[in-house]
UniProtKB/Swiss-Prot annotation:
Subcellular location: Cell membrane
InterPro entries noted in UniProt: YfzA (IPR025627)
UniProt name for this protein: Uncharacterized membrane protein YfzA
Domain of life according to the entry: Bacteria
Keywords, in A-Z order: Cell membrane, Membrane, Transmembrane, Transmembrane helix
Membrane association type: Multi-pass membrane protein
Protein species of origin: Bacillus subtilis (strain 168)
Amino acid sequence: MDKVYKRSWFQTFLAFLVSQLYFNFVELTGWGPKYREMNGFPANIVELDFFQTYLSFYDNPWFNIITVFLGVFTIIQIITGITKDIRN
């Protein structure tokens, strides 16, 4: 049996955690890059009531969108990776 840290789903999970640490560091210190205003489709997503109520983790809307996208991707990767591990 392989080590857990060598599995792809675990590496994806670590990448998600590192991104969250970066986002928190930037939010707390204000040392992050300046972002443009949102227009078009991303702005429509951020302005949804559901998104503002339940998925607003940071003050920066770009961080919120990236967090939701990476979170969904990470969950899918973990589920598929663990099911492959169980089958083997």
